[in-house]
């Protein structure tokens, strides 16, 4: 009989290891309050360090354990003055690690229960629904937040909102004893509440007691081999169990010094992770699969960085949150060896892990030296449970029958680190456990020889770059697509071989006959609509869309489609005939509208398009749109380069590719260049980035660099919804003078906007510098009697003149170089004082030498072109030096991210709030992820577009 797939870790007792490691006579602390006091008394000079979201120079602020202990006990005393009953829940909604950390410990010491709130939804309806839900769940509505959070809560009545800054001010008035507690806690008291993602409905509140957290921390410390000499680097938000329990409380128990970095700093500049490992002698850090992939993608060609970092201290890199692609992890290890100053001393292990909010984060790990051991599977195995944790694989139907070793089934875990219940939700708690105290994780796994790996999911979510998206919500919207039979649609998570992140497949029964004469047209329209909805909700289209006749889609006895069964059939090839029929119909639909390239220029461009998109030349129509085929801003550079080489042209302006993305249109433009047609060089500020859809068009004004490439990836999200136009500054093409004043620019853009869209209502937005231009264009249109229903101002204050006067030629050049990724943020900051003493030519030469060769090639830059671009940006700065805002528009929506300087709160309250004076209607201030220069980049644009489109809809567009 085959052994059953049940496994527990027989390792030595970690409690004994803890006592030996920290040399404590007091023993293991019984509560978190005891844990903090013990760490303070034993390691008073060890440090908690922080890099905030506003630390643009990555400067580190540090507090000793002793200093931090005094700070939070003073805060606890101030909290006690609120006179809240013991055990009342306080929703902690803060941004920075130190603030969150301080607030949580203060609540614990005051006898209150902190609940960590992740970022609230930008969708007003969803935000209000969530807040109403947790208010009902907790029976109270006490929030501790900052100014930005208070603004988000301002429209919701009945909340007891307290500012953390006020609490700090109160705490500074007194100094309590170093062992002060307002109320004593017991091991089984509720300690901290964590909200689940809510991807399958409203969030549940996971209850962790002092006992479960301490048990988890002891086990983690043993697995990580923590000692008081260990240095930890964490960038995961404190509202996540990994950021708070795994990377703060567990290390604190063992006396480890810690560096907590705001996520935006790492995600916008992954090199910072390596610099900090080097500078702070970091032993343990964390990087999920998407960050490993990003670092490999961004740095593998940076030969200039080889040997630049001392990475010898690093001994473990944790990875979790999504499956880790084996080849990505191996490439990451190889990359760090190349970047290491002494490759032979770069010897760390990658620890892929499994964990959930309910398990106090990671509870199963596979710690592997990938330089010595090659992975056996496409994704890294997840290994064995930490001490005290058990795992087993059972039949998912009954949740109890053990599966044999090597057979897939439902993964269940149990142990002293598992949560005790969902707050005020006995039904959900009961359904999450089976007899024997086994917790149902909702994942499909396989255990072979004590080593676990995941093979799928039972729960209805898709994880894209570590972000969880709900399948049921997607299905609800897809059910409304014309061509889909209601209740006969299912979506299932799916990861294709070699894919770096999870995706999904959509199965549906069409309302039309798949064998009918009009099937190709109807199926093409239906699939396009399914893709559009999916991209807007999940940030990516389905990997496959499979139409199945309704009589062949089996439902359960409860009248539901089985996602698991459909996906199994798909993977095994049982649905191959339906996939083939869909491909045949799509091909027929394409053939019906196919226009064969006729001129030599069209044929040449069709061949170039085909090469870029891995098509045959005869598959490209003369009416094919470069961006609808999937073209990105990087692909534009390749098209430009190959087109210039084929046609023997010194320059095909990128702007003209953006304006003429259709094969026949671009061929006509290129023909004009070849034949020196003067009309091909006329200035038109409008760049149509996508033209499909019948909703009100959106017009975007360029940032201070004058170019519109930043908008290319954003425009894709508006396909089949509304046209997307961008304004490009004058002066890029030969013979085009720079704008001489703000008024001249506004007049040009307003006239072009009216020519493109003769009547309102209008929608306009501007990024950075473009925000004030958009505001002025909106005013001009209103003065013409037109209605402007949306004015979007992205991370720009109304008063810019002082800033324009601050930017000298060197600063403007470095801003442009950083914006174009020619230099790093750190380089741009450090170089300014050094370059100011040089001539312009010498300054450009320094930047040119620092620029990555592949980036220069991508942008088709030369020193002369860079110099000219700096001049264009300088002309826009000159236009802004005398700008003084006045008048008003119907309403403004101000989107704000982490600013170039200062804190986000000061940026909002002191710089952006004055827009209220220029808005007749109620202005809206909307927090968006990322930093000033990264909020629309590849990593942030999926979230930005959802927030931005939500505001368009809120304004009735």
Curated annotation (Swiss-Prot):
Q: Which biological pathway?
A: Secondary metabolite biosynthesis
Q: Which gene specifies this protein's sequence?
A: atrA
Do you know which SUPFAM superfamilies this protein is assigned to?
Acetyl-CoA synthetase-like, ACP-like, alpha/beta-Hydrolases
Enzyme Commission number(s) from the entry: 2.3.1.-
Q: Which organism is it from?
A: Tapinella panuoides
Give me the ranges of the annotated region Adenylation (A) domain.
Answer: 59-464
Q: What is this protein called?
A: Atromentin synthetase
According to the UniProt record, where is the region Thioesterase (TE) domain? 697-947
Q: Name one Pfam family in it.
A: AMP-binding
| Protein family per UniProt | Belongs to the ATP-dependent AMP-binding enzyme family.
What positions does the domain Carrier occupy? 596-674
Q: What does this protein do?
A: The L-tyrosine:2-oxoglutarate aminotransferase atrD and the atromentin synthetase atrA catalyze consecutive steps to turn over L-tyrosine into atromentin, which represents the generic precursor molecule for the entire terphenylquinone and pulvinic acid family of pigments, which are widely distributed secondary metabolites in homobasidiomycetes. The first step is catalyzed by atrD which converts L-tyrosine in to 4-hydroxyphenylpyruvate (4-HPP).
> What residue spans carry the region label Thiolation and peptide carrier (T) domain?
601-671
Q: Name one GO molecular function term.
A: transferase activity
């Amino acid at each position: 009989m085959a052994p059953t797939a049940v496994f527990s870790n027989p390792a030595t007792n970690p409690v004994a290891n803890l006592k030996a490691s920290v040399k404590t006579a007091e023993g293991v602390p019984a509560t978190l309050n005891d844990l903090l006091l013990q760490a303070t008394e034993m390691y008073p000079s060890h440090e908690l360090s922080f890099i905030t979201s506003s630390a643009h120079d990555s400067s580190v602020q540090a507090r000793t354990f002793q200093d931090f202990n005094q700070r939070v006990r003073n805060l606890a005393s101030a909290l006690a003055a609120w006179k809240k009953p013991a055990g009342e829940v306080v929703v902690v909604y803060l941004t920075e690690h130190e603030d969150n950390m301080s607030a949580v410990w203060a609540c614990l010491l005051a006898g209150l229960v902190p609940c960590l709130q992740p970022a609230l939804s930008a969708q007003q309806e969803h935000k209000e629904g969530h807040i109403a839900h947790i208010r009902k769940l907790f029976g109270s509505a006490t929030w501790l937040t900052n100014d930005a959070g208070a603004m988000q809560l301002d429209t919701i009545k009945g909340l007891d909102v307290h500012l953390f800054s006020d609490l700090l001010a109160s705490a500074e008035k007194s100094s309590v004893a170093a062992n002060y507690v307002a109320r004593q806690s017991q091991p089984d008291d509720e300690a901290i509440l964590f909200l689940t993602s809510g991807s399958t409905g409203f969030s549940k509140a996971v209850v962790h007691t002092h006992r479960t957290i301490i048990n988890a921390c002891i086990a983690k410390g043993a697995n990580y081999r923590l000692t008081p000499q260990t240095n930890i680097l964490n960038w995961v938000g404190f509202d996540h169990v990994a950021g708070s329990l795994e990377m703060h409380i567990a290390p604190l128990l063992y006396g480890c010094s810690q560096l907590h970095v705001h996520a935006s700093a790492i995600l916008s500049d992954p090199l910072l992770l390596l610099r900090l490992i080097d500078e702070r002698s970091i032993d343990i850090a964390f990087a999920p699969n998407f960050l490993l992939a990003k670092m490999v993608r961004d740095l593998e060609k940076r030969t200039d960085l080889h040997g630049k970092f001392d990475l010898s201290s690093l001994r473990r890199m944790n990875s979790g949150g999504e499956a880790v692609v084996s080849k990505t992890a191996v490439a990451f290890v190889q990359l760090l060896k190349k970047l290491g100053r002494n490759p032979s001393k770069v010897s760390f292990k990658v620890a892929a892990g499994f964990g959930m909010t309910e398990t106090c984060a990671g509870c199963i790990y596979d710690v592997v030296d990938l330089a010595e051991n090659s992975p056996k599977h496409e994704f890294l195995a997840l290994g064995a449970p930490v001490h005290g944790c058990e795992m087993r694989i059972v039949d998912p139907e009954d949740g109890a029958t053990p599966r044999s070793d090597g057979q897939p089934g439902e993964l269940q875990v149990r142990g002293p680190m598992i949560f005790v219940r969902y707050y005020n939700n006995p039904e959900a708690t009961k359904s999450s456990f089976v007899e024997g105290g086994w917790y149902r994780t909702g994942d499909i796994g396989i255990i072979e020889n004590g080593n676990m790996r995941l093979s799928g999911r039972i729960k209805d979510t898709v994880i894209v770059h570590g972000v969880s998206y709900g399948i049921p919500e997607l299905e609800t919207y897809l059910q409304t697509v014309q061509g889909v039979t209601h209740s006969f649609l299912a979506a299932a998570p799916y990861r294709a071989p070699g894919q770096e992140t999870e995706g999904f497949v959509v199965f549906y029964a069409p309302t039309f006959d798949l064998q009918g004469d009009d099937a190709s047209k109807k199926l093409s329209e239906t699939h396009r609509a399914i893709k559009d909805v999916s991209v807007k909700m999940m940030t990516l289209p389905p990997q496959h869309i499979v139409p199945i006749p309704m009589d062949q889609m089996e439902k359960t006895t409860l009248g539901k489609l089985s996602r698991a069964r459909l996906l199994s059939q798909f993977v095994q090839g049982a649905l191959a005939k339906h996939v083939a029929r869909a491909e045949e119909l799509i091909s027929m639909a394409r053939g019906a509208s196919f226009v064969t390239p006729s001129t030599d220029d069209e044929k040449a461009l069709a061949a170039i398009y085909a090469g870029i998109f891995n098509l045959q030349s005869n598959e490209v129509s003369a009416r094919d749109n470069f961006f609808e085929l999937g073209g990105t801003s990087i692909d534009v550079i390749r098209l430009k380069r190959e087109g210039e080489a084929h046609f023997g042209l010194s320059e095909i302006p990128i702007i003209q590719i953006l304006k003429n993305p259709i094969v026949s249109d671009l061929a006509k433009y290129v023909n004009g260049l070849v034949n020196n047609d003067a009309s091909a060089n006329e200035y038109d500020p409008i760049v149509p980035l996508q033209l499909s859809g019948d909703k009100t068009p959106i017009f975007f004004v360029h940032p201070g660099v004058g170019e519109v490439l930043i908008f290319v990836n954003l425009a894709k999200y508006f396909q089949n919804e509304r046209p997307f136009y961008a304004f490009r500054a004058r002066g890029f093409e030969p013979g085009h003078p720079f704008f001489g004043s703000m008024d001249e620019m506004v007049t040009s853009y307003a006239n072009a906007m009216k020519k493109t869209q003769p009547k309102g209502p209008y929608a306009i937005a501007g990024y950075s510098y473009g925000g004030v231009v958009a505001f002025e264009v909106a005013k001009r249109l209103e003065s013409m009697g037109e209605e402007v229903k949306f004015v979007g101002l992205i991370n720009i204050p109304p008063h810019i003149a002082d800033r324009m006067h601050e930017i000298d030629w060197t600063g403007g050049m470095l801003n442009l170089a950083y914006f174009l990724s020619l230099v790093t943020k750190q380089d741009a900051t450090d170089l300014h004082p050094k370059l100011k003493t040089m001539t312009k030519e010498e300054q450009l030469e320094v930047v040119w030498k620092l620029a990555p060769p592949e980036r220069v090639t991508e942008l088709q830059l030369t020193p002369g072109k860079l110099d000219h671009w700096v001049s264009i940006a300088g002309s826009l700065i000159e236009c802004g030096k005398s700008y003084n805002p006045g008048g008003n528009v119907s309403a403004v929506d101000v989107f704000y991210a982490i600013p170039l300087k200062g804190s986000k709160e000061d940026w909002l309250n002191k710089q952006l709030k004055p827009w209220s004076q220029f808005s007749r209607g109620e202005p809206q201030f909307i927090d968006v992820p990322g930093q000033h220069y990264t909020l629309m980049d590849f990593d942030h644009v999926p979230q930005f577009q959802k927030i931005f489109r939500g505001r368009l809809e809120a304004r009735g567009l």
